[in-house]
Amino acid sequence: MGNNKKNGQPQYAPSHLGTKPVKYKANKGEKMHDTSGQRPIIMQTKGE
């Protein structure tokens, strides 16, 4: 059971998210960051 190599992952790489490297999470903000300099278009929804 411990020698399970599926999906081409190395044995030492866990598949659950809690043990991913910190760099993996830290980089997400830069990808999502808006660098266009424009203000966001605010769409009014019901009840606002």
From Swiss-Prot:
Region of interest (Disordered), residue spans: 1-48
GO cellular component: endospore-forming forespore
Biased composition (Basic and acidic residues): 27-36
Cell compartments where the protein resides: Spore core
Induction: Expressed only in the forespore compartment of sporulating cells. Expression is sigma F and sigma G-dependent.
GO biological process, one term: sporulation resulting in formation of a cellular spore
InterPro entries: SASP_SspN
UniProt family annotation: Belongs to the SspN family.
Protein name: Small, acid-soluble spore protein N
Organism of derivation: Bacillus subtilis (strain 168)
